Amino acid sequence: MRTKRVFHAVDSHTEGMPTRVITGGVGVIPGSTMAERREHFLAEMDHVRTLLMYEPRGHSAMSGAILQPPTRPDADYGVLYIEVSGCLPMCGHGTIGVATVLVETGMVEVVEPVTTIRLDTPAGLVVAEVRVEDGAATAVTITNVPSFSAGLDRTVKVPGIGEVTYDLAYGGNFYAILPIESVGLPFDRAHKQQILDAGLAIMDAINEQDEPVHPLDAGIRGCHHVQFTAPGSDARHSRHAMAIHPGWFDRSPCGTGTSARMAQLHARGELPLDTDFVNESFIGTRFVGRLVEETEVTDLPAVVPTITGRAWVTGTAQYFLDPRDPFPEGFLL
């Protein structure tokens, strides 16, 4: 057997959404911060992402995380979040998966009943508290980066749909949030392709007409997620379908999307601090969110969210790159 590269991985899923945690084979990515490492990775190493996320090693909804040494003294590990759509500043379900893998594999000192793990991410420091019972990770609560509303009742002209009203919020990534009935579609997986097509059209229109940019980091820009809320959703329990570029649905309730949703509801005066919020995915799995603090991002009112969810280890693997492989960077259909 011949191979140009060997990548070591622990696979997991968080409430139905995969996280392939890369524990070796990448090396230390250049950069003095995880944000700089992300920029270097995107510019010089994106073939590693596509090799590991795209077919034939991955699939059209694959997600993962690359472990790195931290760039700051208060963190245990650095994390770079990868998926078919790109390299994210932050990923909530991925963080829950990473924290579970670190505990289940003994890559951190395990303390019962709670093991605290501090992760250095491109979006900032993220703290994960892992509930441990008999040595097993049973749930993870993450304290996410400050999240904020970037605009309520915004409008965008979408080809094939017309004028669409949406709220824009940030929870580690930017999210357009709107009721699914506002685009004339039912909340029904039988209509998933129509829902996905509408989501992609909306995010393309937003990015063409009014691309969002994080006020503290110009490298965090663009809307690549559209959260369609189901009829009957409110500030205590919300169901949604999360359409994601370049064309797939989140299987989990989406951690950064849950953070953005809570920031939106707080901005509307509907979700106070210290109140549980249940966010349910398109397949019926759930995260429990809570806003624990008000803060600011530049001059924007912001909130600090926590998200609680579960993940399970599904296997370990080594991924190779045979020098004769006709798809050295993978492919997508």
From Swiss-Prot:
Keywords: Isomerase. Substrate binds at residues 92-93, 225, 250, 255-256. PANTHER family: BIFUNCTIONAL TRANS-3-HYDROXY-L-PROLINE DEHYDRATASE_2-EPIMERASE, TRANS-3-HYDROXY-L-PROLINE DEHYDRATASE. The active site is at residues 91, 254. GO terms for molecular function: 4-hydroxyproline epimerase activity. It catalyses: trans-4-hydroxy-L-proline = cis-4-hydroxy-D-proline. Transmembrane segments: none annotated. Catalyzes the epimerization of trans-4-hydroxy-L-proline (t4LHyp) to cis-4-hydroxy-D-proline (c4DHyp). Is likely involved in a degradation pathway that converts t4LHyp to alpha-ketoglutarate. Displays no proline racemase activity. Its EC number is 5.1.1.8. This is 4-hydroxyproline 2-epimerase. Belongs to the proline racemase family.
